[in-house]
Amino acid sequence: VTTNPATRPFWVVVGSGIDVRGIDVLGQIFDFSGIEKSEKSIKKTWQEFRDALSKGDFSFDDIASAKKNTFLRVYDDLFNKNAGIEYNTVLISEIEKYCVGRGTILGEDENPDFERFIPKTEFIKEDNRFSPSGVEWLYLAIGKEAAIHECAQAECRVKQNDRFGFCHFQFAADSTALKVVDLTIADEMTYKALNDGLETYGQEQVKKSIKKSKVLGFILRNNVNVEEFKKLFTKWGVYTYSKLLSEQIFEPLDEKDNKSLMYAPFQTMAQYYISLGYAGIIYGSTVSKTGKNIVLFDKTTAHPVGAIEDYRIL
């Protein structure tokens, strides 16, 4: 970023992977030429983050040490220190309108009850995306009715003729004020749409500056509302970063992949969100095009309701 230090966007300058250039003497012309470079940079710093965890430079729950790593340091600067995470924050009360549920492949002789859908340490033998083996966090599909069934089936890797059980959940009455991080806020947006909003602001400021310059008889060199610019730029950065993360990091794993290694940085991010007072994470499914998931750090935040659905996969 080349701009007056007073208006320089704090977090973009070093290592973020988001490259915005070309603020001119009027302070408002943007060039969004770095998305491809940003994708590579974010993916690179994420891999370095994973490598540091695999080498034992810090453990997944040592957030103070993890923040010294480039990826989380930059992320924390944007999302925490500069309040960008506000754009990712939703309350449980805001997502109660969506259907939530959990599915499982049933044995032929099983007679499932609600307990079958509650996570229990002794049955969690492998790492999940945001939690190590043995950790009783509640993973649910969230969205419209048809979508959560499709997502749950995909997450369970069902095969034709499998017996499948599905149970709806409901958020606890005392959970409505809890906040969760929504990592999917930009999934439906294009980079062009994101960039257009910031560029439109820049063009409007140029017009205002030219108009004022004509009246005053000289060019205004610092005609930016710093707080307004900071807020707008932070929002753009959060949405762009979220989209890049979603596209470049949330990738499906193969059976041969080491889950403990591949999921370690996600598990660190979960601990980071916990340190900021969050109760869960909404994230996109890597195996279902229509589905989203939510992981709740306290499994009592939601409870089973209604009749258990029991059917064959066709």
Task: Give the ranges of each region predicted by the language model.
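Short active-site loop/helix that positions an aromatic residue
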Residues: 144-158
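Conserved structured core elements
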Residues: 141-145, 263
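Active-site and NAD+-binding cores of ADP-ribose-processing enzymes
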Residues: 1-131, 154, 158-314
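A short, exposed loop/beta-hairpin motif centered on an aromatic-Gly-Thr core
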Residues: 132-141
